[in-house]
Amino acid sequence: MTYLLDVSVLVAWGWSDHVDHERTAAWIGAAKRRKATTLMTSAIPELGFVRVSVQRTGGRVTVAEATETLAGMVAALGARHVLLADDRAARQFPEWCSSALRTTDAHLLELAAAHGATLATLDTGIPGAFLLPTKVANGG
């Protein structure tokens, strides 16, 4: 299975004080143990990780620190990681995308699908996305 990790997954995984850190870390750990799993990032979720990381701490985490944390996260994925180039235009959105707040979700969902991947998220309400489970079974 191939997953594109969205901003919510990256932020929860990257910061141990996040309410969903353990859930996300467990899912990523299980995914890494599965032989046929690829975990993708792209520029939009990576930029979102840096932005949210700085904003959620009121600037106590700097852009440089957030970038360094992200680099460590990507390195931890090892051979399971692929950086997905964003080759999709942002001119059409599905019917469920009726507010500006959902445009990035819709774009990432289409980007993932166009490359044979599934968008992995902690956000409910994204039709067709994979919502990380609250409990991860042994082995994933």
Predicted regions: what they are:
Residues 30-31, 73, 111, 136:
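Hydrophobic helix-cap positions at the C-terminus of alpha-helices
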Residues 12-14, 52, 129:
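Residues that scaffold the ATP/ADP-binding catalytic core of kinase and kinase-like folds
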Residues 76-124:
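Active-site neighborhoods of divalent-metal-dependent phosphate/nucleic-acid chemistry enzymes
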Residues 8-9, 44, 124-125:
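Alpha-helix/helix-capping structural signal
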Residues 128-140:
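Active-site regions of enzymes building and remodeling cell-envelope glycoconjugates
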Residues 41-46, 104:
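Short, conserved alpha-helical segments within structured domains
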Residues 1-41, 56-68, 137-140:
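Short, well-structured N-terminal submotif of metal-dependent ribonuclease cores
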